């Protein structure tokens, strides 16, 4: 058995229950599960928590649109989240719901404690509020008048509220981050938090709302509900037994958390708000917050309206659980966003799972049966290529240890497949089918098959955290069991004389893309149909195309005011994301004989690659201004629906660059 290395408490972000999670959301639970299984193999006593975030204005509005109570709505969505988490074989130890009675009771106590000690005070809030992000913003923080995080419209908000004294703890948090370099990972996330939020100065945080009711009431002032982020973040301590009046032994054992695994879009809440709340509660901070990248559909944001959303259950139906796990783990870089398309999934399935792994196991077991009746024996008759194979196999564990210590999961799984590739090369080098023709080479053939069987056993054991079902199927075919982690750098432990299965199972049969495509088309058509139904429900029975959006009229302008604005057709020559912003793109736009640099808040709906070559409508004489530190010399015109989806205004007919819009 691996040496007991102590506790390892890890969490995912709890999933927001506004709808069914797609594969981009599901990526996090698969990633977390791989880490949890790996840590267990290493010898840690892992406690792995996940769950659902179930309060907030957005959920109340969704429930009203569905004509059911908020609790009925979150019960349905939370059940769907848990079903999908179970479907992808996640081995969590605890599934928390923020509507759980014990959580709500503890949140009330936490709020009261912070109020009693002077960290929370009563005041009034006036500013802008983003409902999808559940975030408050000042006018100066908005980008193009919209939420700087998601790019959607914000609404004026003025209400009595309770506030948390964030500024009181800011210097202490800055010192902590500077003296704990592993606290925020990757480093780019740390730099973003320091430069964009902490160093410019923190404002006190609104921690209650009165404009909606779906939340945890403030115990001593029940017309207020607790701000969703104070409610949601505390799940990491409430569910394991924290109590301001006296915590449980489980809490004392598990806290502080060793890892909070979250999406990069909520790093601010977990590395600024959460540690400051903990400081106020006089609790130690988590050891690490890791903000993973996003998984994008073909480089684009997933959207039902486009029919391009990929759900985990659809992937599992078409390819199986472990193929789904393999794709999202293998394709996600350490820091940058990954890309998923149906074509890429099929390509990886055939090249990696069917060819490299499945073919290797099948050939090895089949040759053992064909040449030795399935009995695997080490004869000690070695060849020149054996040493290199053994060196690669026995070194793989330590290479994986190095990668997993930095949470480079994609790199770790690549190391396992490098082992399998080396095994395939070993078959080509030793040519067992040639050895089998020479009776004098029988002992050498036996040794070759022993080396392959031992190598595959080690590889399967290393593969287990990532593809658990496949790893177990492999060792069953080899009539052995998964190897202990401490033994995975040793070669020759496969029991001599073991008989492998006489009926090898095809682990991954190659897929014909032509057979899959009709199923993909049906999935996409269904999504568009569901989207249209949702839009009709939201728009009072009208389709999305028929719907009318009412907006508040702005102050009238004169014709002279209008003629001051110059609109022309522009052609986008190049485009790139703005480094300091999650929503901005910077485009070089050719307008007649000139080229202007224009910064636009359209990143959530367009990738830089999509922008290049588009003909767009441009306000060309807008006074230049800097957005996120980048000069912008005009404005691209867009339409926006009530869901915040942006669509660039483009000429209906072909028009030359520079054509006047009148």
Report the location of each language-model feature.
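Intrinsic disorder at enzyme termini
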Residues: 474-561
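Cys/His-rich short segments
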Residues: 117-170, 174
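Phosphate-backbone binding interfaces of nucleic-acid-interacting proteins
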Residues: 541-662
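A glycine-rich helix N-cap at a beta->alpha junction
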Residues: 78-91
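Secondary-structure transition/capping motifs at alpha-helix termini
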Residues: 1-4, 38-45, 66, 70, ...
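N-terminal catalytic cores of NTP/NDP-binding nucleotidyl/phosphoryl-transfer enzymes
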Residues: 2-77, 94-111, 116, 133, ...
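Helix-rich, typically C-terminal accessory recognition domains appended to large enzymatic cores
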Residues: 122, 331, 343-382, 392-500, ...
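Structured secondary-structure scaffolds
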Residues: 2-50, 102-106, 150, 156-370, ...
């Amino acid at each position: 058995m691996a040496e007991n290395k102590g506790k390892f408490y890890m969490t995912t972000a709890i999933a927001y229950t506004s709808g069914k999670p797609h594969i981009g959301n599901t990526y996090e639970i698969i990633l977390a599960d791989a880490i949890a299984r790996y840590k267990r193999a290493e010898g840690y006593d892992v406690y792995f928590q996940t769950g659902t975030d179930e309060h907030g204005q957005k959920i109340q509005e969704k429930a009203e649109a569905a004509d059911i109570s908020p609790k009925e709505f979150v019960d349905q969505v939370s059940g769907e989240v848990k079903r999908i988490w179970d479907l992808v074989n996640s081995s969590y130890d605890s599934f928390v719901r923020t509507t759980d009675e014990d959580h709500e009771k503890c949140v009330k106590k936490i709020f009261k404690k912070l109020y009693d000690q002077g960290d929370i005070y009563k005041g009034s809030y006036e500013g802008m509020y983003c409902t999808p992000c559940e975030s408050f913003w000042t006018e100066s923080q908005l980008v193009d008048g919209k939420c700087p995080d998601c790019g959607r419209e914000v609404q004026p908000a003025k209400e009595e509220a309770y506030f948390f004294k964030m500024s009181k703890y800011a210097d202490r948090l800055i010192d902590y981050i500077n003296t704990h370099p592993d606290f925020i990972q990757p480093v780019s996330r740390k730099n973003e938090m320091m430069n964009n939020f902490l160093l410019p100065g923190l404002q006190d945080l609104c921690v209650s709302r009165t404009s909606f009711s779906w939340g945890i009431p403030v115990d001593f002032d029940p017309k207020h509900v607790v701000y969703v982020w104070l409610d949601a973040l505390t799940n990491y301590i409430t569910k394991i037994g924290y109590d301001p009046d006296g915590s449980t032994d489980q809490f004392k054992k598990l806290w502080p958390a060793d890892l909070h695994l979250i999406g990069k879009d909520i790093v601010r809440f977990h590395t600024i708000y959460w540690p400051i709340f903990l400081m106020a509660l006089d609790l130690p901070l988590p050891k690490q917050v890791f903000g993973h990248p996003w998984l994008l559909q073909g480089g684009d944001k997933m959207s039902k309206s486009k029919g391009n959303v990929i759900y985990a259950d659809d992937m599992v139906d078409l390819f199986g659980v472990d193929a789904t796990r393999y794709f999202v783990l293998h394709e996600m870089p350490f820091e940058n966003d990954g890309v998923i398309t149906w074509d890429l999934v099929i390509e990886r399935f055939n090249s990696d799972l069917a060819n490299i792994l499945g073919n290797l196991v099948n050939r090895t077991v089949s040759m053992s049966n064909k040449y030795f009746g399935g009995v695997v024996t080490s004869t000690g008759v070695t060849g020149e290529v054996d040493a290199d194979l053994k060196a690669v196999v026995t070194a793989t564990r330590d290479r994986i240890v190095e990668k997993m210590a930095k949470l480079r999961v994609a790199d770790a799984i690549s190391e396992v497949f490098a082992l399998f590739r080396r095994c395939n090369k070993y078959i080509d080098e030793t040519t067992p089918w040639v050895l089998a023709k020479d009776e004098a080479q029988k002992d050498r053939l036996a040794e070759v098959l022993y080396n392959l069987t031992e190598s595959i056993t080690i590889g399967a054991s290393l593969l287990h955290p990532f593809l658990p079902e496949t790893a177990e199927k492999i060792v069953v075919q080899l009539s052995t069991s998964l190897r202990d982690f401490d033994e995975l750098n040793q070669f020759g432990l496969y029991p001599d004389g073991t008989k492998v299965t006489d009926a090898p199972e095809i682990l991954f049969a190659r897929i014909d893309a032509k057979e899959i495509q009709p199923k993909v088309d049906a999935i996409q058509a269904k999504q568009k149909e569901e989207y249209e139904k949702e839009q009709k429900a939201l728009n009072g029975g009208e389709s999305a195309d028929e719907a009318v959006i009412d907006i508040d009229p702005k102050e009238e302008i004169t014709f002279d005011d209008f003629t001051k604005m110059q609109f022309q057709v522009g052609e986008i020559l190049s485009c790139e994301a703005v480094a300091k912003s999650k929503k901005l793109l910077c485009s070089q736009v050719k307008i007649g004989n000139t080229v202007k640099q224009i910064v636009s808040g359209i990143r959530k709906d367009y990738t830089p690659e999509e922008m290049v070559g588009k003909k767009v409508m441009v306000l060309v004489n807008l006074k230049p201004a800097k957005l996120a530190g980048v000069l912008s010399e005009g404005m691209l015109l867009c339409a926006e629906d009530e869901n915040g989806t942006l669509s660039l205004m483009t000429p209906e007919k072909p028009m030359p660059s520079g054509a006047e819009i009148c």
